[in-house]
Amino acid sequence: MTIGLIFALAGCSLLMPKEAAADNIDITGTVQSRCIVNTDTAGVYGNPNAYTLTTLPASNGQVPIVRIDVSLANAYNAEISYPTSFSSSPSLSDTVAWTGAVATGQTSVSGMSAYQAASTTTGAKRTYALTLAGTTWFTVASTATYGGGGNKAFPGGSYKAVVLAECIAQ
C-alpha cells in the first residue's frame, strides 16, 4: 500500500500547476538619420573696428554656410542658431551684444525657396520644416559688439563662436 500511495502522490504532483518560467527577450534595431548636417563653409570674424567682430564679407568676414541633406520629406525640422556667446576668447570684463540672422541660401529643389517664409524664430534660433527631400544651404550671419553699447575695444587674441545646427525628428 505504501507503494500505491507513493504512485498516487507522484501522479497528483504532475497535475499540480507549475511555476511559470519567464525571460526577457530583447528586440534591437538601428535607425539611420535621413537628415544630415554638414559644414559647407566655416565662418570667419572680420574686425572692422575695435569693438565689433562680424562675419559680414564687407568687413573681411566670412558668413558660415550649413548644408542640410534630407532624404525623407516631412520627417525633420532644421533648427539653426547664430552664436550668442564665445566658446573661447580672451578674458572679457564687459558685456558682448550679439546679433545675427539665419537665412535659406541655395537649394536643390525650387520649392525649398519657401522655407524662409514658413520658418519660425525664437531668440537666436530659426526653425525650418524640411518638407522636401534634397539639399538646402543656410547662411548664418553673426555680429558681436563689445562694451554693452559703449563701444569698448575687444582685447587682442583669438575668438571663437559656434553655430548650432540640428536635424530634429518631427
Q: What do these predicted ranges mean?
A:
Residues 1-8:
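Sec-dependent N-terminal signal peptides
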Residues 9-19:
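C-terminal segment of classical bacterial N-terminal signal peptides
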Residues 18-97, 123-170:
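N-terminal small/polar-rich segments of proteins
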